[in-house]
Structures are given as C-alpha cells and as structure tokens.
Amino acid sequence: IKIIMNKGYFEIIRAGINTTFQDLGRKNLYHIGIPFSGAMDNRNFLLANKIVGNKLDLPVIEFAYQGPLLMFNGHKINIVITGDVIFKIRKKNNEIEGNCYETYQLEQGDEIDILSTNKSVYGYLAISGEFDLKFQWGSCSVNTKANIGSNEGKKLNNGQKINISKINSNLEKKKINYFNSKIENIR
C-alpha cells in the first residue's frame, strides 16, 4: 500500500442515520429558489474547525442521533468530535472511549465509531485538513430535500469513500472546555 503523506480517505463502514457534509451554508439565495443550508448547530460546527486548526468555514461531517463508523486510510490525521456524543476509536490493539472537544490522531487502518448523540441531536467530525468536495453556489452544505451540495446533495452511504485533499502536518493535541470556550463569528 502506497501512502501519500498529505492525502487520504475515510471508508464508510456504517453511514449513520443522517450524515452529511455541512459548512456555513448558502445565504441570500432564497429569492432565486435556493434554500438555506448549513450546519444546524453553528457553535459546535465552528468549534470543531477551531480545535483542529482549520479555517472556520471549512466543511465538516454533520451527523444526527447515530453517526458513522469510518476507517481511515492514509498516513496520520487529527480529528475532533463536537457536540454531546458517545464515540470510540479503534486502533490496532486498543479501543479508546472518546471525549468530545479533544483531538485524536488516526493512523492507517484506525476506525472511529460514532455510536450516538447524547443530549444533543447533532454532532460534528472535523479533520486537520480538507475534504475533497464540490462547491455549489459557494457552499459544500448538503440539502437533501433540494438535492444540492456536495455528494450530489445526498446523505453519505455505506461503502462510500470520503477523499481528503489536504492533511495539515501540524498534529498537536488540543482539548477545550465547551462551556469556557470563546468563538468569534457566532451569529
């Protein structure tokens, strides 16, 4: 297996109930029939990108109730889960109970299993890098009713691959307290 250092992909083993790509969304297009879209929980969306060191408007994976089970294929990448979420990370000989708002480093073959949201409906998975997605009307956000956005406007499916076009090499460990965190640009 040839591993390219700054690229990789996630293989979706279980897609989850309602798993899509979301960013800040499309605004000011409703007058021409393009519906609003974007992350449902703006604070957790922004915090996810901030924790992994991304620009705040980069697309993330949004999931509701039960999230995906993903296997990472690539060199190394940092991920974070935000929201009130129960998840596990499976490494070669180890299973870790995950903590939200804390980065974890995934390596070739590691799995992240997002079991369920707890006291929230939505949760977010951000990576230290960028998903390889198609922009439509200035956004990657998926609106499944209108079938617009990346992934042809559809939810993610079992067996699908999520390509990562760029992985940040800065893999420092970060952790924040949700209640004491400050984030700018919240509505």
Segments the model singles out, each with a brief description of its role:
Residues 1-187:
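Conserved "landmark" site that anchors the functional core of diverse proteins
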